[in-house]
């Protein structure tokens, strides 16, 4: 190890930055975040630095560097484009035993400014010791995706209860075990999901001996339309820490592959006229599993609150006092239309968008047809594959032109995506010949014409033909 990672407390302490350009402005910004009292030495200032000066956040010495300017400084950064000046700053700072960093010159530095993942008060620093800063930044980017932005709130929450926990537990080992349980349990998740008041109440109950630290919870997570890259960071984190996963038919196999490997998997998918479990039984299953103390992932395709019956499920959870959180997902209308190259709104074609379902019941589809055939809008129909012929007939019967563009997308956003385009008059026959299978999404409106120009996603031909 060539360098020792340390964190310096700089609040209200004098720091000197030599240089007034863009790079210097970035270094000044870092020092400002740490609360330092910053003086910039430069004949001229970058607009960002000039703004900071006008707002009274920094001091400015409008001159070239002089050694006397180092007097009193506890840290120095040289960020000029003059190599000789940078060497002089390094030499004079080291003669005074002042830590010095020279940008892009590790041989002149006594400290390195790392790449930083800021989740204040939690900080992660990544450094290559000046040998490969680009690699360090790439690694920092990967770490950024692994640490939720709300981890800073979790660290601040822990600080709030630190003394109370010290009073409650006498040994370091007891405190460590307690905090691990807090961070990995319901209280930690409440903080991360923004339910801090509930977390404080639960923490106070536990510390007073009136509450339990270990109890179950439910994560109602939207798995998106199929492509796992469209998952949110929070969805992925909860998927990888659940004890049991209750999942639907519409969750793609690629998304399911990201669920914690040793989690129990319970399939409750529904298809037309065939339900593995009635909805009320699913609701009660979630309650039972949570009461067993398990972290339950309720994973749904798309978004749980858009035709996903998520509202019914959390009603039951609330009635039974089960902690839960809801993680939105990209609904099929958004994700699938984007991957199909069909914008849902467009200045020239559609100023509004309507979502509905196309369930076929007793040979008919019961929809507000007058609303569906209004001009200058896009209609998106979920679960309408079987009812497609009836949908097209009814739209024409209620005034829509037979040549109105319409498209249907099978397994959108995945490598098995297939798109069939036509009109209200022609699409049912085209779909029958194509042999499409659910899940499918129907898009009706003039925006479908744009697909010819805007289609960008090209699944593997081998996969599509095999599907």
From Swiss-Prot:
Family per record: In the N-terminal section; belongs to the precorrin-2 dehydrogenase / sirohydrochlorin ferrochelatase family.
Residue numbers spanned by region Uroporphyrinogen-III C-methyltransferase: 216-467
Protein residues bound to S-adenosyl-L-methionine: 225, 301-303, 306, 331-332, 383, 412
Residues that hold NAD(+) according to the record: 22-23, 43-44
Modified residues (Phosphoserine): 128
CDD domains reported in the protein's UniProt record: SUMT (cd11642)
Region annotation (Precorrin-2 dehydrogenase /sirohydrochlorin ferrochelatase) ranges: 1-203
GO biological process per UniProt: cobalamin biosynthetic process; methylation; siroheme biosynthetic process
Presence of keyword Transferase: yes
Pathway: Cofactor biosynthesis; adenosylcobalamin biosynthesis; precorrin-2 from uroporphyrinogen III: step 1/1; Cofactor biosynthesis; adenosylcobalamin biosynthesis; sirohydrochlorin from precorrin-2: step 1/1; Porphyrin-containing compound metabolism; siroheme biosynthesis; precorrin-2 from uroporphyrinogen III: step 1/1; Porphyrin-containing compound metabolism; siroheme biosynthesis; siroheme from sirohydrochlorin: step 1/1
Pfam families, A to Z: CysG_dimeriser (PF10414), NAD_binding_7 (PF13241), Sirohm_synth_M (PF14824), TP_methylase (PF00590)
Enzymatic reactions: uroporphyrinogen III + 2 S-adenosyl-L-methionine = precorrin-2 + 2 S-adenosyl-L-homocysteine + H(+); precorrin-2 + NAD(+) = sirohydrochlorin + NADH + 2 H(+); siroheme + 2 H(+) = sirohydrochlorin + Fe(2+)
Protein name as catalogued: Siroheme synthase
